[in-house]
Amino acid sequence: DLISPDRLAGKAATTLESWLDDRMRQGIGHFLIIPLFFGPSGALTQAIPALIARLNRNEGNLEVRLTAPLCPLPQGEPRLTAILLDRIVTATRETRLQPRRLVLVDHGSPSPEVNATRRWLAADLRSRLEAGTQIEEAAMERRAGPQYDFNGELLLAVLRRLARADGQSP
C-alpha cells in the first residue's frame, strides 16, 4: 500500500491486511494462503505470521494456514526446473540460437535461505542440460557488504564478464 490512491484511479490498494480485516468483519476467519514465492522469504517467515498475530490480538478468531513456498528445500521442486527447461527450449526455437551460456537470475535477497532456492534450481538445471552448456547465476540487485556475498554477482557484472570472455556466443 505504498502507492498513493491517486495513482490507482483513486482507489487504495488492497493489502493482505486490509483484505483479511474485511473478511473478518464479514465473519470469515479461516484462510489458506498459497504463496507465489520460490523460497522462504521474510514475508513468509516473519511478516505474515506477525500480521496474523496482530490481527488475532485486535480481532481474535483468525485461523490462517500458510503452505510451503514453491520450491521447499532441501528437496526442491523438479517441476520448476522442468518449466525453466521448457522456456529454454522455446527461446532456442524462437531465436534459432543454440545457447552455450545461460544466466539464471533472481531478484536478490538479504536471506541466504531464499538465495539457496536459486542455487538449487541452477544445480538441477546443470544436471539436466547437455554437457557444455554453462549455467551462471546472478542477482538483479543486492545489498552492499560481505555478509551478502551469498547472492553472487550482479547480472550486469556477469553479462560484462561473459561478453569479455566471448562476445560472439549466445
Which residues are covered by each model-predicted region?
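Active-site-proximal alpha-helix that buttresses catalytic centers in soluble enzyme cores
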Residues: 1-170
